[in-house]
Amino acid sequence: MRTATLYRYSVPMEAGVILRHQRLKSRDGLLVKLQQGELSGWGEIAPLPEFSQETLDQAQVAAECWLQHWVSGVESDDSVLPSVAFGLSCAQAELNQTLPLSADYRKAPLCTGDPDELFAVLQALPGEKVAKVKVGLYEAVRDGMIVNVLLEALPDLTLRLDANRSWSRAKADGFAKYVNPALRSRIAFLEEPCKTRAESREFAQDTGIAIAWDESVREADFQVEAEPGVAAIVIKPTLVGSLSRCQQLVQQAHQAGLVAVISSSIESSLGLTQLARLAAWLTPATVPGLDTLDLMQAQVVRPWPDSPLPLITTEQLGVVWHR
């Protein structure tokens, strides 16, 4: 006997969470629960506005269609909508007990704001000091100066930077100009500095600052391959698709000598704990990019270890579909 339930959640965000062009006031998504006999499995379907190709309503329609087949005993292919494919594949993997339970709860802290505050946070980091800094929101020169100050002040710090394709080549060069060449090797990578891949490649080769592909990974013509100046690919499962697609990308990256980083798309605590399990399984040597829970005002169904945020339980969620 198979049953399935689809829940909808809405979690208020902290003030000041801005995506590309809009403030994100709440994080809205779906949780799916599959039940077969004594076994159950959960997954999260949460398209990210401005980044996902599908809306939440479109994802819900696709999920309901897939679930209708599943409860009838008909096995369907992965959804073509990445967030749906990811959430349903997680639920199936939990149900089939193929998603390992061990998790990598390390997270590269996401740093925004005042450099003095960042310094205190980063100095207190235990173990390997890896942090992520969003760049491209302010002047490129300011970003360069902040990165330089942090690397200079903390000799054991490695930074991951993310520009979200926001710079022209000239602005990217303006950023690099303010980062001491002797410190640039401690930038693990800068995600997609320029508006085009060609400009980003040239930037990496001209400055010695390694880059990573992020948005590119989700484009139809993208190939995972070794290239001069390219250090990593960033895999955001909600935007990429099923667990098997994520696994394929990780394997291709490792074969090409690239680092693969499992990264969040601002999922709820349930989705984040699954990403931590995915990271421990597929990329155990790499700190995942999962420091987004504190952008929210609550957790959902499954808590992140040691988080003080209140937990929204299953009983508090709205059921949108059940069979």
Swiss-Prot record:
InterPro entries: Enolase-like_C_sf (IPR036849), Enolase-like_N (IPR029017), Enolase_C-like (IPR029065), Mandelate_racemase_C (IPR013342), OSB_synthase_MenC1 (IPR010196), OSBS_N (IPR041338). CDD domains: OSBS (cd03320). The active site is at K134 (proton donor), K236 (proton acceptor). Pathway: Quinol/quinone metabolism; 1,4-dihydroxy-2-naphthoate biosynthesis; 1,4-dihydroxy-2-naphthoate from chorismate: step 4/7; Quinol/quinone metabolism; menaquinone biosynthesis. GO terms for molecular function: magnesium ion binding; O-succinylbenzoate synthase activity. Mg(2+) binds at D162, E191, D214. It catalyses: (1R,6R)-6-hydroxy-2-succinyl-cyclohexa-2,4-diene-1-carboxylate = 2-succinylbenzoate + H2O. GO terms for biological process: menaquinone biosynthetic process. Its EC number is 4.2.1.113. Its cofactor is a divalent metal cation. Keywords: Lyase, Magnesium, Menaquinone biosynthesis, Metal-binding. HAMAP family: MenC_1 (MF_00470). Converts 2-succinyl-6-hydroxy-2,4-cyclohexadiene-1-carboxylate (SHCHC) to 2-succinylbenzoate (OSB). Belongs to the mandelate racemase/muconate lactonizing enzyme family. MenC type 1 subfamily. This is o-succinylbenzoate synthase. It comes from Yersinia pseudotuberculosis serotype O:1b (strain IP 31758).
